[in-house]
């Protein structure tokens, strides 16, 4: 099915409709904002989402000037989901533009 609700990368599976994330056999807790940010990236695999697009999707149209929020929450996601958060393989920064999810 093309609209598979579960996205898998590394040893992580993300069930977007159920808001459930599992690494191996361990469930990972994300805050609502972390989950919205991750879902926005997962729904656009391989595509760069600009900071403005992500801020608008996650925080709403009034937050487009608060890119520091985005950096903080991307750091949280990397700490929780990347094997080596300092060298992310899946949640990548496109410097000066935005972020990309690479499966």
Segment roles from a protein language model:
Residues 7, 13, 84-86:
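Generic detector of short alpha-helix boundary/capping microenvironments
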Residues 18-97:
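Positively charged, aromatic-enriched patches within helix-turn-helix-type DNA-binding elements
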Residues 9, 14-16, 101-103:
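Conserved catalytic Walker-motif region of ABC-type ATPase nucleotide-binding domains
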Residues 1-8:
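Basic, amphipathic DNA-recognition helix from helix-turn-helix-like DNA-binding domains
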């Amino acid at each position: 099915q093309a609209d598979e609700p579960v996205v898998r990368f590394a040893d992580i599976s993300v069930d977007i409709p159920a808001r459930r994330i599992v690494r191996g056999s361990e469930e990972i807790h994300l805050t609502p904002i972390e989950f919205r940010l991750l879902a926005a990236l997962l729904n656009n695999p391989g595509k760069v989402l600009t900071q403005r697009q992500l801020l608008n999707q996650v925080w709403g149209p009034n937050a487009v000037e608060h890119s520091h929020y985005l950096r903080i929450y991307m750091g949280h996601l990397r700490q929780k989901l990347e094997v080596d958060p300092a060298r992310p393989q899946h949640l990548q920064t496109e410097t000066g533009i935005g972020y990309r999810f690479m499966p």
